[in-house]
Curated annotation (Swiss-Prot):
Cross-referenced Gene3D superfamilies: 3.30.230.10
GO BP: tRNA 5'-leader removal
Name of the protein in its database record: Ribonuclease P protein component
Gene: rnpA
Annotated source species: Leuconostoc mesenteroides subsp. mesenteroides (strain ATCC 8293 / DSM 20343 / BCRC 11652 / CCM 1803 / JCM 6124 / NCDO 523 / NBRC 100496 / NCIMB 8023 / NCTC 12954 / NRRL B-1118 / 37Y)
Lineage start: Bacteria, Bacillati, Bacillota, Bacilli, Lactobacillales
This enzyme's EC code(s): 3.1.26.5
Catalytic activity: Endonucleolytic cleavage of RNA, removing 5'-extranucleotides from tRNA precursor
Length: 116
């Protein structure tokens, strides 16, 4: 995922936290904020030390980024997302984490249900 698709600055994270809608499941918490003037969606990732050691946290971040990259065509472009990984996300497969990401994005009404 290119750097222009990432939220990095602390004040940008804080802005999304303060003006957010959030949903969660056992593996992720997703905060979202609409930005109509934006040309593409942006994502901020947070994986705390509760998830595991540094290499495990990096592993989880890579899996989240890959899942979002695969879902990119289905995501609305005028959106900022913050994804916080919960400790249960450690030691899970890529396919499982992608399915959980789809689940939480459907709960947030970011992705459409198949039967709609």
């Amino acid at each position: 995922m290119r750097k222009t698709f990432r939220i990095k600055k602390p004040e940008e994270f804080q802005h999304v936290f303060n003006k957010h809608r959030s949903v969660a499941n056992k593996y992720f918490i997703v905060y979202q904020m609409d930005k109509p003037e934006q040309k593409h969606f942006r994502v901020g990732l947070s994986v705390s030390k509760k998830v595991g050691k540094a290499h495990e946290r990096v592993w989880v971040k890579r899996r989240i980024r890959q899942s979002l990259l695969e879902l990119k065509p289905e995501l609305p472009q005028e959106l900022d997302l913050l994804v916080i990984a919960r400790p249960a996300a450690a030691h899970r497969s890529q396919k499982f984490l992608k399915n959980q990401m789809i689940h939480v994005l459907k709960l947030a009404k970011i992705l459409k249900e198949e039967n709609e």
